[in-house]
Amino acid sequence: VNWKIMWGAASAVLLWALWYGWYQYGGDISYGRLNKIPFQEIQWYHAMAPGLLLILTRVGVPVSTSFLVLSAFASTFVLEKMLMKSMMGYAVAAVAAYVIWIGVSKILDEAKPVKESHKIYWRVGQWFTTGFLWWTWLSHDMANIAVFLPREIPVDMMLIISAVFVFGLWYMFREGGGKIQNIVLEKHNTRYVRSATIIDGVYWIILFFFKELNDIPMSTTWVFVGLLCGRELAMATVTGKEKFKVVFPLIGKDFLKMMVGLAASVGVVLSIHYIIVPNGL
């Protein structure tokens, strides 16, 4: 599919998520995720998090945007709650993916060519699951941008935000996802339509569950890495083609990169709370 078509579809879902959240939550586009993080006037040290995020993402580290950005604004109490919810998300995703792909691997060869008569169903399924996943993901991670904005955003500012977001998507699709895309592409059979559809569907359901659980922000990155971890272990268990000595280093590398991102987040929050503005939050 041409990247411009995907950009148009993604932009449509994004604009729906943005304006629906704004209308439903009284001008707050965070979907209530910032209820425990009051608005603060932007200070110079708040730029540390986006700066680190840009650097780590460019080198392919699957850093948690929620931890890195919100840690500069949240209290240590809220950060602890975010960490616990994200750890639970990682564990739930890994276990669910393992169980699901044990079953899927027994009845479906994801790498086998799709029958011509079935292709339309898988394509529709992929667009459907990806669209709902995109909306659910936005309802989680919109808070990472909304934290810099007033909790009640006026219409004129919303129009500017919408334009900036759509332009950002245009750049991202034109670049093809960048180095961070390798986290997915290096996994077993993730390029196939059936694999992508099932991954998107499972990821969507898990994120939706945690969205409805409570309004504490969480790392959607951790959930995704946990899902890929469980899937890789399941496929190695069932097929026997992937030796565990090959799978474990792959999983370990992703987990290590996650810890690098977490360490950066902790560094930001400790610097702000105990060095730059001690007792300020």
Predicted features along the sequence, with ranges:
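Multi-pass alpha-helical transmembrane bundle typical of ion/small-solute transporters
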Residues: 1-281
